[in-house]
Amino acid sequence: MSASSLPLPQGKSVSLKQFVSRHINEIGLLVVIAILYLVFSLNAPGFISLNNQMNVLRDAATIGIAAWAMTLIIISGEIDVSVGPMVAFVSVCLAFLLQFEVPLAVACLLVLLLGALMGTLAGVLRGVFNVPSFVATLGLWSALRGMGLFMTNALPVPIDENEVLDWLGGQFLGVPVSALIMIVLFALFVFISRKTAFGRSVFAVGGNATAAQLCGINVRRVRILIFTLSGLLAAVTGILLAARLGSGNAGAANGLEFDVIAAVVVGGTALSGGRGSLFGTLLGVLVITLIGNGLVLLGINSFFQQVVRGVIIVVAVLANILLTQRSSKAKR
């Protein structure tokens, strides 16, 4: 199980070799991020500018907020491919509620509840009816995408000017509000994963669900809760996306689920479950965001960008696997 931060443990004498071995994945990702900054700074006009760095933070928030819950889902040995359509559907529902003059606070509360309920539905299908999580969330992906496009005729639903939404889509002390929310939620999920019985149960279920059940862990409840959290954070992302775009859009967040899953896996979380790190996911989010931003500034064809991004992601995952295997051998 990877640690969630890099500082040396207090009260323990740890050699540099042991420290590097323990955090080889995070160190590797930091090196990758440094290389990306160097390459794009030299070749992509405007990449290092303050304005572009704020854009990087905004894009990172769109991926990162959903990635915190996805980390727990993958650690538990599950997967959720419904994130993108859920984010878009929430933004559409929020826009319609505001058009019907529902107060913003009530509208936000309703779409947060909607996101949690949709996540719970996926969790119940997995935890109660034992439907594979990929199948359950793939069905949800199709239903939400189709419903959103049907409700809007594939057109954006405009949102009238609103001071609170403008603030959510803007900056606070020069930093995007969405990025600040991402950081707060990151700290919360680090606490949940490391300091609570629920967090430890997630790792146990991912390591061996049968053994976890025999140890008294309610596997069904754990599975339902992690999908509920995923739906809730997807709703948060949907609200922030609507605030940023000034509209609800069923076509927004297209492919977001793949960026989120890629960020988690690149960050070192094992798809087989039982091992993962939120700090690694944070670095994975930065890697995926920097790649996307840099390729746009380089003027690479949008279709070819997907090819380049896919190759880089596969290489990063392979590097993560090799580094982890090398670390495991070193510990022996």
Curated annotation (Swiss-Prot):
The keyword Ribonucleoprotein does not apply. The chain crosses the membrane at residues 28-48, 63-83, 84-104, 105-125, 131-151, 172-192, 222-242, 251-271, 278-298, 303-323. Keywords: Cell inner membrane, Cell membrane, Membrane, Transmembrane, Transmembrane helix, Transport. It is a multi-pass membrane protein. It comes from the Bacteria. It is found in: Cell inner membrane. GO terms for cellular component: ATP-binding cassette (ABC) transporter complex; ATP-binding cassette (ABC) transporter complex, substrate-binding subunit-containing; membrane; plasma membrane. One of its GO terms (molecular function) is transmembrane transporter activity. Its main location: membrane. GO terms for biological process: transmembrane transport. Pfam families: BPD_transp_2 (PF02653). Probably part of the binding-protein-dependent transport system YphDEF. Probably responsible for the translocation of the substrate across the membrane. Belongs to the binding-protein-dependent transport system permease family. AraH/RbsC subfamily. This is Probable ABC transporter permease protein YphD. It comes from Escherichia coli (strain K12).
